[in-house]
């Protein structure tokens, strides 16, 4: 018998899950599957569950208010966006930073809602784990200087062009 287990990411927002769901659906060309207002919850009258589908993954966002034991998001958990080319890197990088996100290093950023993302070109393993040790070292040094990853510069460092 086949296991049909499915994993859904569940994200707790203090008060803007609906807004965040719309933002992520627009960035990833996804869709909102459901938006349910919950009644009589300890979190108060503005508690919503919003389920969205992004790139064949399901996410449920809750507008749960401030609750003991639930903290803001941190970089300890991140979502990786695998990009086929630099054009996709540029698109996701600028889209996820829109409205107050903060860039970090090595392709990492935090969006305006506090979620951390890694925007990574598919070609990265070719240069960071390639057979040429000196090339790998140069590619790593080039990457460590970057916020948004530039695959051409990383390739050039690897190839020593």
Across the structure, where does each feature detected by a protein language model lie?
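Vicinal oxygen chelate
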Residues: 17-18, 26-27, 54-56, 76-116, ...
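Acidic/histidine-enriched, glycine/proline-rich intrinsically disordered or flexible terminal extensions
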Residues: 136-161
């Amino acid at each position: 018998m086949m296991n049909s287990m499915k994993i859904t990411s569940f994200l707790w927002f203090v008060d803007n899950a609906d807004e965040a769901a719309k933002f992520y659906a627009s960035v990833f060309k996804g869709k909102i599957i459901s938006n349910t207002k919950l009644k009589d919850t300890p979190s108060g009258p503005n508690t919503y569950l919003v389920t969205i589908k992004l790139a064949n993954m399901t996410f449920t966002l809750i507008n749960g208010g401030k609750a003991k034991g639930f903290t803001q998001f941190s970089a300890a958990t991140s979502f990786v966006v695998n990009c086929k080319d630099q054009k996709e890197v540029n698109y996701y990088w600028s889209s996820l930073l829109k409205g107050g996100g903060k860039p970090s290093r090595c392709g990492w950023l935090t969006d305006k809602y506090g979620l951390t993302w890694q925007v990574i070109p598919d070609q990265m393993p070719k240069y960071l784990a390639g057979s040429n040790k000196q090339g790998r070292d140069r590619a790593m040094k080039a990457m460590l200087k970057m916020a948004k990853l530039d695959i051409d510069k990383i390739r050039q460092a690897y190839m020593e062009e």
